[in-house]
Amino acid sequence: MAKAVMMLPVLLSFLLLPFSSMALTQDFCVADLTCSDTPAGYPCKASVGAGDFAYHGLAAAGNTSNLIKAAVTPAFVGQFPGVNGLGISAARLDIAVGGVVPLHTHPAASELLFVTQGTVAAGFITSSSNTVYTRTLYAGDIMVFPQGLLHYQYNAGQSAAVALVAFSGPNPGLQITDYALFANNLPSAIVEKVTFLDDAQVKKLKSVLGGSG
């Protein structure tokens, strides 16, 4: 019995091997995007060049001509295969005057926001006590948002704001609370019950955000 107990950690280690990243056992593992993603990331490309480790997609401003007047340009594993297995990714955030990134979460990564232009008001809410931490950020300032916590950013200035964002995972995921509640086909009667909003308010928000039901 004692011997069996001692063998358990070894057996568990072997079971977990398929879910560990190849980048942990070799220098890197540039994603082969022609293959399917797995819990351990994408399989490695057979042939790799210097271009796999550089990405130029964040040089141009995103299109902020939309409802929230903001745009996120990602450099996740799907756009930048070189980050596969490294536990990192990046993005560019553009927020026009009056723009906002509504309350949202990244279920698979923490976020580090670095403001390069303009003024950004930002904050997050803790999961247990609902404590709110807010800050107004200027060019050169940074703020961290812990993984999975609700947070927001909005332009608090009179000119366009730009920020570079780093994530602690190759594909951080995104769920915007407003869209999750009102841009779907969940029946309005249920939304009313779970949000304490009345029928008119729910239908208005569903109409604005493209929901149905």
Swiss-Prot record:
Oligomer (believed to be a pentamer but probably hexamer). Phosphorylated on threonine residue. Induction: Down-regulated by drought stress. It is found in: Secreted, Extracellular space, Apoplast. The keyword ATP-binding does not apply. One of its GO terms (molecular function) is manganese ion binding. Belongs to the germin family. Coiled coil: none annotated. Mn(2+) binds at H104, H106, E111, H151. Residues 1-23 form the signal peptide. Glycans are attached at N63. The gene is GER5. Keywords: Apoplast, Disulfide bond, Glycoprotein, Manganese, Metal-binding, Phosphoprotein, Secreted, Signal. GO terms for cellular component: apoplast; extracellular matrix. CDD domains: cupin_OxOx (cd02241). May play a role in plant defense. Probably has no oxalate oxidase activity even if the active site is conserved. It comes from the Eukaryota. PANTHER family: GERMIN-LIKE PROTEIN SUBFAMILY 3 MEMBER 3. Transmembrane segments: none annotated. Residues 56-203 form the Cupin type-1 domain. This is Germin-like protein 8-14. Disulfide bonds join C29-C44. Pfam families: Cupin_1.
